Every structure is written in C-alpha cells, then in structure tokens.
Amino acid sequence: MVENHPFEPWLPENARLLMLGTFPPAEKRWCMPWYYPNFQNDMWRIFGIIYFQDKFHFVDVEKKTYRLDAIKKFLGEKGVAIYDTAQQVIRTKNTASDKDLQIVQPADLDGMLRQLPHCRAVLTAGQLATKVFSEHFGIKEKPEMG
C-alpha cells in the first residue's frame, strides 16, 4: 500500500538549515503529529541537551509526548526547516526502519530549496535520506555513516 507523506514541509522564511529525514513512522508509533514523532526517537531530547543542557526541555514526561509548540517556536527562531526525502513510500515490512521503505515518489527537493533563499546547509538524517539527496543532486562522494 502506498503511503503519502502526512505532514507539510516546515519551511520558516529565515531557515538557514534544512533537515531531511526519509519518511515518518506509521501513525501508530506517533506521540505527536509532526516530525520525529516516535517517543523512542531521541531527536528532540538531543536538541534539548545541545541548546538547553536539558534532555527534557521539549518533553512532556507526564503525557509521554513532545512539546510541539515549543519545538516549532525553537526551530523558527533558529532558522531550521524540516521535511523528508520521500513524498510517497511503500513499507515492505511493518517497521519504521528506512531499510524497509521503498520510495515511490521522492520529495520535490528543488522546489523546497527554492522556497528557502537563506538556506546554506542541508543535514540528512540517515543513510537512505543521504542516498536520495546525493543521487538527486549528483553528489558522487558520500560521507561516511556510523
């Protein structure tokens, strides 16, 4: 079954960084309806540690979710855009793993970057996101992943 991306790109006008993942996990794994929604994923905890020396800065511990308003405010202030490299996928297994995703339609990376005139850097989160981005832009030398 083909899945469409459930979220709109987050593209603040002042974005200098575009973070690209591959595709969100299945909705049953979400604790919030936005990027990096799985409570087991540490992305928002890592941001809390780096910027606030507090891994719970974006976490609502009691409700086992993330504080979405605080995340959006923070990303807007810092100039961070977020989306994924896939617009449509097929999950070959019932997992959230990139290795079990077949990309049916990649995201419109060119269109996204045109909407971000101040963007100076792109961060790809994961091997498949890196592969899709690199192939799209003809980047032959890929960074080491670990």
Where are these regions (language model features)?
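Short amphipathic alpha-helical segments, especially helix-boundary/capping motifs
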Residues: 19-23, 84-86, 107
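Short, electropositive, low-hydrophobicity segments enriched in small/polar residues
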Residues: 25, 83, 130
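Glycine/proline-rich loop-helix segments at beta-alpha junctions forming the active-site rim
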Residues: 2-5, 9-12, 86-146
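Active-site and ligand/interface coordination hotspots across diverse enzymes
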Residues: 1-49, 53, 115, 120, ...
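Hydrophobic/aromatic beta-strand patches that form the interior of the parallel beta-sheet core
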Residues: 18, 81-83, 123
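Gly/Ser/Thr-rich helix-start
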Residues: 22, 80, 127
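Short, surface-exposed acidic-centric catalytic microdomains
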Residues: 32-101
